[in-house]
Regions:
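Inter-Walker segment of RecA-like/P-loop motor cores
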Residues: 3-54
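Residue-level detector of functional hotspots within protein domains
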Residues: 15, 24, 41-42, 70, ...
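Glycine-rich nucleotide phosphate-binding loop and flanking beta-alpha elements
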Residues: 46, 64, 93
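Structural motif
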Residues: 55-57, 85
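Walker B catalytic acidic pair
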Residues: 59-63
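Non-catalytic, compositionally simple segments
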Residues: 67, 73-215
Length: 215
């Protein structure tokens, strides 16, 4: 949230026409025209329910669970014109707030779901049939990074990173998630299976299987 504040501050400072309408303070950015404030909020699991947001901007949603976004949406329930902006690359963890947002956008695009609300999404990810060929197919890079179509330097850098990701497993997760928007769990990702799931399948596994296991 503080990084977003810095970015907004730079935009305001770059334009004399904008600057006179805003007051940039240490803890917030205030719009003098309509007396509203932009306040950076730190991630929390249970302390966002009391906030009232006319508009919210969430960056790196994939790094969070769904609670912060849902808390902000709940705070807007009485507003006629609701607005929330979500920005993120892909992340390897399964419990992230980005997955549902992508699914909702695709379901609305396919006509499977319609909430009656305006929902605008820019999804930069490769076609699913191209994903298995990420090591060699340049279309994966172009679809995930459309700015690279007209930027030869960026495309060359992406190809170099792809080559390293092919050669080194420990570089693969970052490349696929951050530069291709493909969810991938590489080496070093922490795996977790809850106890209830283990208990449900324990009867189907011989007792010898569990002996000597490091947990």
């Amino acid at each position: 949230s503080s990084e977003l504040k810095v970015a907004i501050k730079k935009i305001i400072k770059s334009s004399p026409l904008l600057e006179k309408h805003f007051k940039v303070m240490r803890s917030e950015i205030r719009c003098l025209m309509c007396d509203t404030e932009y306040t950076p909020l730190a991630y929390s699991k249970d302390k966002l329910d009391g906030k009232l947001a006319h508009l919210f901007l969430a960056d790196e949603v994939g790094a969070m669970d769904g609670y912060p976004v849902e808390a902000m949406r709940s705070s807007q329930i009485t507003l006629k014109s609701k607005l929330g902006i979500l920005i993120s690359t892909q992340y390897p963890n399964d419990d992230n707030g980005l997955k549902d947002e992508i699914d909702i956008a695709k379901k609305q695009l396919d006509g499977v779901y319609s909430s009656g609300k305006k929902y605008f999404a820019l999804l930069y990810e490769p076609d699913i049939e191209l994903v298995p060929d990420w090591k060699t197919n340049d279309s994966v890079l172009y679809q995930s990074n459309p700015v690279a179509v007209d930027n030869a330097d960026l495309f060359s850098e992406l190809k170099d990173n792809r080559q390293l990701a092919v050669l080194y497993e420990n570089k693969r997760e970052n490349f696929l998630c951050k530069h291709c928007n493909i969810q991938y769990k590489g080496v070093g990702s922490e795996g977790y299976v809850d106890l209830i799931s283990v208990q449900n399948c324990s009867e189907d596994v011989p007792d010898e299987f569990w002996r000597g296991k490091i947990v």
